[in-house]
Amino acid sequence: MFKVSKSARPIDWTTKDYKDPLVVRQLKKDFHGKCYICEQKHFPNLNVEHFIPHLDDETLKLDWNNLYYACSRCNSIKNKYYDDLLDCCNEDHLVEEWIKVYYRMPDEDIEVINGCPNDHSYHPKAETSKELIIKCFNNANSGIQEVSKEDLRDKIIDVHSEFLDLRRE
């Protein structure tokens, strides 16, 4: 997770469609083209994700502050099952300090650490966020999840290799 400064609702958004190109383009800009959960860029299928599951509530479904930019993998894993997460758009939620993601070895699962103090009121949200991120990086419960996990892992390995090359220069 990374901190996001979300813009105001687009003035030109007049439809009742949260998948309106205007909405998607603004979300892409606000979230720097990255999935807010796994942080990958250039993913094949994007979703407009509802931070709080809308459960057919039209107000939540169209609430600009509830719309987030996500890859289809993370969105399908989060689905309606996670609703008590750290909010990367809330300046009080120190997502970059509290959630640490570690890549150890290519064949090992990604490790996620909850660094929010145990006595902090946001600790339960940080713990739920940690659990979701672990699933988003490591789940392989179906053929689709297995292949998308491999693709995500390959991207991590590529970025890690590029980083190591830069360090050598």
Over which residues does each language-model region extend?
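Short, charged/polar micro-motifs that form catalytic or ligand-binding hotspots
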Residues: 13, 17, 21-28, 57, ...
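N-terminal, Lys/Arg-enriched amphipathic/low-complexity engagement segments
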Residues: 1-44
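Histidine-centered nuclease catalytic patch
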Residues: 16, 37-70, 78-93, 97-99
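Residues in flexible loops and secondary-structure boundaries
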Residues: 9, 35, 56-59, 107
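Extended charged
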Residues: 1-8, 21-24, 72, 76-169
